[in-house]
């Protein structure tokens, strides 16, 4: 990341991320199509779960941004021990976040969140079923996002494209099988959509871990890097918290939109959910470019190559 011509480097780093995010956005659209075939109530329930899903992602994704910046900067400075600590501490923080989400679900947070947006018992049941599973098994999402960030931080975005793409494809394949009970699987309805998501995320996380262990010599995995250090945590969240807040604001806005639309009809909420996912399809290339640029800037900032930053 410190020698390749900047324009070529940004394209090399960003293009795989843009492609993988487009595949992710396509999955979101296909997922909505399958859920909609169950019933309007099912689609509305899943739509009402979306703001809290986004909030969960904001915590893990924002932590990932902090890891990305600290790790790439440390590599630029040739501080390899510091880079290892950023990776290890970041993974631990993401697992802690997943445990908090799981505990919150066991305490009834999923049901309370859905019921705060609708009084329809069928919609509430569908939404609670979906959100409870996503929260309890959020370790899949947390692991995938964080482990993929380690590949991004070290300039290996091609591997990230493979893991994200595979996760989304598995998700698309498993959705109809688990939702409608095909090929001997039980018909699980919206629960099937949630389980398909978790399966895709978990397989992507395992593949990303394999790539890190076998193809990423910049990070040296050992037990010592997983011991939390306050200084490392502070540095991760110094960059990560603004990112968390930015995504969380979008989550709050979506929640408020849902409250307004449920006053009209459940159909309005379902349509808004589909529109939101369609809209994200067009913004994903920008997010991919952003994810490709961050490690380039951080690495060259650490290496004190200001001409490449400019």
What is the predicted role of each segment?
Residues 1-14, 71-139, 186-241, 297-310:
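Short alpha-helical transmembrane segments in multi-pass integral membrane proteins
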Residues 8-68, 72, 241-263:
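Signature of the first transmembrane helix
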Residues 105, 159-188, 202-208:
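Alpha-helical transmembrane segments of multi-pass membrane transporters
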């Amino acid at each position: 990341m410190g020698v390749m011509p900047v324009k070529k480097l940004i394209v090399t780093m960003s293009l795989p991320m843009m492609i993988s995010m487009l595949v992710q956005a396509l999955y979101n659209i296909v997922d909505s199509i399958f859920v909609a075939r169950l019933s309007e109530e099912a689609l509305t329930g899943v739509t009402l779960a979306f703001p809290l899903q986004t909030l969960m992602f904001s915590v893990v994704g924002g932590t990932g941004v902090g890891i990305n910046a600290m790790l790439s900067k440390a590599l630029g400075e040739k501080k390899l021990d510091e880079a290892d600590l950023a990776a290890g501490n970041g993974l631990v923080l993401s697992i802690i976040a997943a445990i908090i989400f799981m505990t919150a679900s066991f305490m009834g947070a999923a049901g309370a969140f859905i019921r705060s947006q609708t009084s329809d018992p069928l919609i509430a049941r569908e939404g609670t079923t979906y959100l409870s599973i996503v929260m309890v098994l959020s370790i899949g999402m947390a692991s995938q996002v964080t482990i993929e960030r380690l590949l991004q931080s070290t300039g290996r975005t091609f591997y990230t494209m493979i893991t994200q793409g595979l996760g989304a494809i598995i998700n698309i394949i498993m959705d109809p099988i688990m939702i409608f009970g095909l090929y001997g699987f039980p018909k699980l309805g919206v629960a099937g959509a949630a389980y398909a998501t978790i399966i895709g995320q978990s397989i992507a996380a395992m593949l990303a871990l394999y790539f890190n262990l076998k193809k990423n010599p910049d990070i040296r995995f050992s037990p010592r890097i997983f011991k939390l250090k306050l200084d490392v945590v502070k540095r991760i969240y110094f960059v990560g918290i603004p990112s968390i807040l930015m995504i969380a604001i979008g989550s709050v806005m979506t929640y408020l939109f849902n409250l307004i639309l449920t006053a009209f009809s459940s159909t309005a909420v379902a349509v808004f959910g589909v529109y939101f996912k369609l809209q994200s399809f067009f913004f994903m290339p920008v997010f991919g470019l952003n994810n490709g640029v961050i490690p380039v800037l951080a690495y060259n900032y650490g290496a004190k190559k200001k001409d490449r930053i400019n």
